[in-house]
Regions:
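C-terminal accessory region downstream of the catalytic core in glycan-modifying enzymes
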Residues: 329-362
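Aromatic/acidic polysaccharide-binding cleft in carbohydrate-active enzymes
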Residues: 170-303
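Carbohydrate-binding surface patches
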Residues: 296-334, 343-345, 375-379
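Short, small-residue-biased leader/transition segments that mark boundaries at the very start
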Residues: 1-6
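C-terminal beta-strand-rich structural cap/linker in extracellular carbohydrate-active enzymes
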Residues: 356-386
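Glycoside hydrolase catalytic-domain groove-lining segments
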Residues: 128, 135-195, 215
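Structural recognition of the beta-strand scaffold that forms the well-ordered cores
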Residues: 9-13, 49-53, 93-96, 128-132, ...
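Active-site cleft segment of glycoside hydrolase catalytic domains centered on the general acid/base Glu
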Residues: 17-128, 133-152, 176-180, 210
Length: 386
């Protein structure tokens, strides 16, 4: 089982049934919902708001193997069972379909977008939130073209529903990312604790701390309501859930068992992406309104997102170019006691735990001008840390 936390709202769900031959078993449904009820109604985990029945059911790696009709049948069985417990049904709604964007299993009649559209047609009245997974390439996102794909999916969503990315990260199999893929493969050779089956070996790199907030900006500006970075901690997931330490999935912001299990204390250190991702999560909290932003000179190396939360403003900007960029920022309101955080490869202001510290505090601003270094990221906010 797995969960995705959106501040005080948790998506809880099944990865697959205990055995693949239980994929259409009502016994599995009964067991699963009984445990969900135990968590929510008996133990009081009221933070659980959504439930997902299969991980990536369109995948050829899933027990469903792209069988939409089987998945739909089970979706309605789970809904029926949840409905038998009024308190649970009031608290928890279904998240679906959890399919992988830009993917088509040859065994399935639908690609991911078609699966989403069919889910809306068949089951919108029982869906609480629409949920997708996304693993674009670096060139795709940095070129700005990924926003078109995001918009295509978002345009199908009914106006009274939200859409989120329940998993998001980067994969480098596309031709435009061939140099990154070559480096990925080089790092796998004789690696002591992964075979590279499902990893991002570049999650250790400084640039990943630019690419993840950039992806978040594109998702936020496309009208999505949240995304979860895959993943938090390398120690949480091995290939096939085997528990074997020689083949873990390396995607995280650290590995909490680096010393104890993997004989590498360095793996426990916070990776660069933690710096920027923690800031995005802190200053664009659940309930923030995302504002329309525009880069007036059409510069395709500067990306920005802005949000308002309880009257406080946050602006995040990333420069993915090779040159420093002068920016002049027009603000919709005065910022009082603003903080400035900067992510630069040679300038990462941190406390003793490695957590980000602002480089400026107490700023009072009606506008903002500065030079953003090449390959860097900033957050400007007057939202309190308290």
């Amino acid at each position: 089982q797995r969960q995705m936390c959106i501040r005080d709202r948790v998506i809880f769900g099944e990865y697959n049934p205990p055995t693949f031959d239980m994929k259409d078993s009502e016994k599995w449904v009964d067991m699963s919902v009984a445990y969900l009820k135990y968590l929510v109604c008996d133990l009081g985990f009221t933070c659980i708001k959504y439930f997902n029945i299969f991980n990536e059911p369109d995948g050829d790696w899933a027990s469903t193997n792209g069988d939409y009709l089987l998945w739909k049948k089970m979706l309605f069985l789970f809904h029926k069972k949840i409905s038998e417990y009024p308190m649970l049904a009031k608290q928890v709604k279904l998240a679906a379909p959890d399919v992988v964007m830009d993917y088509h299993n040859s065994n399935s009649e639908y690609d991911a977008e078609g699966w989403l559209m069919q889910t809306i047609a068949d089951a919108d009245d029982i869906i609480g939130v629409y949920d997708l997974h996304a693993y674009p390439g670096q060139a795709e996102v940095r070129s700005g073209s990924y926003s078109k794909l995001l918009a295509s999916y978002k345009n199908h969503i009914p106006s009274d529903k939200q859409i989120i990315l329940g998993e998001a990260g980067y994969k480098y199999w596309r031709t435009a990312d061939s140099l990154l893929m070559a480096e990925y493969n080089r790092r796998l050779v004789n690696h002591p604790y992964t075979k590279g089956t499902d990893c991002n070996m570049l999650c250790y790199d400084y640039f990943y701390g630019l690419d993840m907030p950039l992806l978040a900006m594109e998702v936020m500006n496309a009208g999505y309501s949240g995304l979860a970075m895959w993943m938090l901690d390398d120690a949480m997931h091995s290939n096939g859930d085997s528990g074997k330490p020689e083949d873990i999935k390396i995607w995280g912001m650290w590995n909490i068992l680096g010393e104890e299990v993997f004989n590498s204390p360095k793996e426990e250190e916070l990776r660069p992406s933690f710096y920027t991702w923690s800031l995005m999560c802190r200053y664009f909290p659940s309930g923030a309104d995302i504002l329309k932003t525009e880069v007036l000179d059409g510069n395709n190396e500067i990306y920005a997102v802005a949000g308002m939360y309880k009257g406080k403003l946050t602006v995040a900007i990333v420069n993915i170019g090779k040159e420093d960029k002068k920016i002049n920022l027009s603000l919709p309101k005065e910022m009082t006691s603003a903080l400035l955080y900067v992510y630069e490869e040679e300038h990462l202001n941190k406390d003793e735990n490695g957590f980000p510290l602002p480089v400026q505090t107490g700023m009072k601003l009606n506008s903002y001008s500065n030079t953003i270094k090449s390959n860097s990221f900033i957050i400007l906010t007057d939202l309190s840390d308290e």
